[in-house]
Amino acid sequence: VHTEIQLVEQQLNRIILGKPQQIRLALTCLLAEGHLLLEDLPGMGKTTLAHALAESLGLSYRRVQFTSDLLPADLTGFSIFDARSQQFSFQPGPVFSQVLLADEINRASPKTQSALLEAMEEHQVSVDGETRPLPAPFFVIATQNPLFHSGTNALPESQLDRFLIRLSLGFPDRDAELQLLQQDSSASQHKIVPALLSTERLIALQQQIPRQQISDEVLGYVLDLIGHSRKRSDMLPLSPRAAKGLVRAAKAYAFLQQRSFVTADDIQAVFPAVAEHRLQPRQQQQYAGLAQQLLLETPCLV
C-alpha cells in the first residue's frame, strides 16, 4: 500500500540532501490535506523542494513571487471582455494549480495574503460574483523570510493558523553540502524528475488518513499538550483547530511509518512543526522553542 509514497520520499531525499525529517513532514502535510509554510533564509532549497514535490507526484505546479504590488486578481484570475463574442471570458490565475508555491508571502500586502488564505480554506475562489472550485488536490507551499528581513509583512496569528505545518530546512550538514558542491549545478537544475504517483492514487492515499486508528490514551495526551498551552501566560494558547490538525498530521505521519495506528511518538514527532508557529509569545520579543517546552513539561503516560 505504501510503496509508491516511499518511492516519492526516496526520490525527494536524493534531490534535497540531508533533510529526511523535513521531507517526511512535508509529505505528512500533503497527505493530511494541509498547507505548508517554509520559513528560511533565501537560497536554502525551499523552491527546489516545492518543485520536486510537485514533479514527483505528477501535479500541476505554479510559482508566484509575492511582491508589495501583487494584486488579489493576479492570483485568482480575472474576466476579460471579448469584443467578438460580446461576452466575458475568465482567465484563471495561478491559484488554479494543484501545487502553488507562494514565494515570500510576507512581502505581499495583507489584502493579497488574505485572498490566498481564503482560497486555502475554502478550496474555491469567487471572481466577479461567480464561485469557482479549485483543483484537487490543492496544496499551497508558502515561503517566507525571517521577519528581520526588510520589506516583510508578518502574517497575523489567524492566518498562520491556516497552515498545518511550518518547517525550516536550515543549513545542510558538511557531507550534504559537499555533495551539493560536487554536483553540476546547471545539469541538476534541468534534471527531469519522474512522476511516481498519479493524481487519483494520491487522492486515494489522502482518503486513507482519517481511517488511521488512534486510542483514547493517545488522544488524552493530545488534550494534555493542548491544555498545557492554555495554562501558560507567556504564549497564545493552541486552538481546537490546532488540536484537530495535530491529530490529522500524526495520522499521516504514522501512515508514512507504515502503521495503521498512531502512537505518542508520532504526536511528539509532528508537534513542534504543527504547534510552533501557533504558539506566539505574548511579549514583543521573539523566541523559539515554545513547542519543545510544552513537550518537555507535559507528562506522556501512554
Where on the chain are the PLM-derived regions?
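Walker A/P-loop
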Residues: 27-67
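Pre-Walker A (pre-P-loop) alpha-helix and adjacent loop at the N terminus of AAA/AAA+ ATPase modules
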Residues: 2-44
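C-terminal engagement/docking regions of AAA+ P-loop ATPases
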Residues: 231-302
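Conserved alpha-helical scaffold flanking the Walker A/P-loop in AAA+ ATPase domains
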Residues: 25-28, 81-101
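AAA+/P-loop NTPase substrate/partner-engagement loops
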Residues: 56-84
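Canonical AAA+ ATPase core
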Residues: 82-87, 108, 112, 120-197, ...
